[in-house]
Amino acid sequence: MARLAGVDIPREKRVIIALTYIYGVGKTRAEETLAATGIDPNIRVKDLSAEQLVQLRDHIEGSYKVEGDLRREVAADIRRKVEIGSYEGLRHRRGLPVRGQRTKTNARTRKGPKKTVAGKKK
């Protein structure tokens, strides 16, 4: 396996897909990176030369925040919102959806499994 930005990327996959295994690199950034380095997106990772891997590593680490740095920045942003007491911070603290989604129904991913409430007797 080749290592880029501290991540083992799969050798058998096409480069454009393999780059998306790095946190902070999606399909668009993978395309931009390959265009900037002049590497064919359809080539397999195992077929890349050492020089091409170095080019990819330098471009990704030089141009984007990825992996640990990005995770730390996101966590710090959330922590800051919680500390200043903003509405978004409140939603994070309560474990509810942050971006205005409905919660009367749905939102089960954020709220967790249903808490059963005893029904009213007739």
UniProtKB/Swiss-Prot annotation:
> Do you know which Pfam families this protein is assigned to?
Ribosomal_S13
Name of the featured protein: Small ribosomal subunit protein uS13
Q: Has the keyword Ribosomal protein been applied to this entry?
A: yes
Summarizing the function annotation, the protein's role is:
Located at the top of the head of the 30S subunit, it contacts several helices of the 16S rRNA. In the 70S ribosome it contacts the 23S rRNA (bridge B1a) and protein L5 of the 50S subunit (bridge B1b), connecting the 2 subunits; these bridges are implicated in subunit movement. Contacts the tRNAs in the A and P-sites.
Tell whether Signal is among the UniProt keywords.
no
Q: Which GO-annotated molecular functions does the record name? A: rRNA binding; structural constituent of ribosome; tRNA binding
One GO term describing the cellular component: cytosol
Any single biological process term in GO = translation
HAMAP family to which the protein is assigned, alphabetical: Ribosomal_uS13
Gene3D superfamilies found in the cross-reference section: 1.10.8.50, 30s ribosomal protein s13, domain 2
Its subunit composition reads: Part of the 30S ribosomal subunit. Forms a loose heterodimer with protein S19. Forms two bridges to the 50S subunit in the 70S ribosome.
* Entry keyword set: Ribonucleoprotein, Ribosomal protein, RNA-binding, rRNA-binding, tRNA-binding
Originating organism: Micrococcus luteus (strain ATCC 4698 / DSM 20030 / JCM 1464 / CCM 169 / CCUG 5858 / IAM 1056 / NBRC 3333 / NCIMB 9278 / NCTC 2665 / VKM Ac-2230)
Protein family membership: Belongs to the universal ribosomal protein uS13 family.
Q: Sorted alphabetically, which InterPro entries does this protein's record hold?
A: Rbsml_uS13_C (IPR027437), Ribosomal_uS13 (IPR001892), Ribosomal_uS13-like_H2TH (IPR010979), Ribosomal_uS13_bac-type (IPR019980), Ribosomal_uS13_CS (IPR018269)
Residue segments, region Disordered = 93-122
- The record's gene field reads rpsM
